[in-house]
């Protein structure tokens, strides 16, 4: 077989539908849009979520809760993610940001206890779970308030 003899298998490539090109094509005259009406017009159609004038579901359902403007955004970092740092290094918010473990604007860092850690690290965080503290101290490291 030569490169110039290559061809796609039958049915792999279908011809595009040429709409509005005469009655013999099967897609002539109205081009599959039916007769008149909003959906037959150029640019016609209803917006997403429109239910024909009936009260839409997003307005039938009640509002709930509120957005607390004083809420603090705390970034969560697991113990297993700290394993990428070298032994005896200081892990603080700046180090976590450099390692791309936290991103964006955060008001604090919380260390959680998922996973294992083997190297001794000095971790500076705003919050931590008891299990995270145990694992860090068991590995020979220490955890301090940032």
UniProtKB/Swiss-Prot annotation:
Example of a GO MF term: structural constituent of ribosome
Signal peptide range in chain numbering: none
Superkingdom as given in the UniProt entry: Bacteria
Any GO CC annotation of this UniProt entry: cytosolic large ribosomal subunit
Keyword Ribonucleoprotein included in the entry's annotation: yes
UniProt GO BP: translation
Subunit annotation: Part of the 50S ribosomal subunit.
Role: Binds to the 23S rRNA.
Name this protein carries in UniProt: Large ribosomal subunit protein uL15
Organism: Desulfatibacillum aliphaticivorans
